[in-house]
Amino acid sequence: GAQGQHVQEKAVTLAAARDLKAALERTGRYRVRLTRDGDVYVIHGRRVQIARDAGADLFISLHADAGSDPALRGASVYTLSEQGAGRAVREFTKGDDWQRDLRLPGRDASVDRILLDMTQRATQNRSAQFARVLLTHIEGDNHPLLRRSHRDAGLAVLLAPDVPAVLLEMGFITNPEDERVLSDERARRRLMRSVAEGIDRYFREPAAPVMVAGDIAGG
């Protein structure tokens, strides 16, 4: 991971994840599963699988950005790109039991593929909705945002076809002020409270639920 002047990305992201977990669990409305709770590396595909196995309604990957220009600072959020969506479908349908994994009938591969595409489109829409809400809450707490703060990419942690997901770059660990915020317990917890408030708002907003393919197939 990235290295700041005084702290490492892997340390501040784990601390932030624990802060966010505590903030969400205090509400009594959420069950939170961390993909790691120590100084271990979890491969990207395994992180996605942990979320899917848990039946997650939302997946957030926390990171700290790095850049060659120390003046660069601010948070940004990534959601899955169209190119990444195509990759996700190809990766997901490699296995022999992908239809069973999504509770599809398995009688007609072309129909099942359409249902998978519908599921993924709904998931992408919900991910984008959460990204907008999240950025609003982060900015509202006077935390700086990177220019063009909502971005898309084909990142491996965003590839689940049925779990809305974002990657949050909390700031630039190579910027002294962002590094201070991420390494200072009080400032970091304040940022994570903003994230928790964004999650609350996301789940309160009226929106069509993400239909998994098996639900669509079943009518």
Region locations from a protein language model:
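Active-site-adjacent mobile loop/cap segments within catalytic or ligand-binding domains
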Residues: 68, 116-217
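Short, basic/glycine-rich phosphate-binding loops at helix/coil junctions
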Residues: 110-114
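Catalytic-core regions of hydrolytic enzymes
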Residues: 1-108, 121-132, 189, 212-219
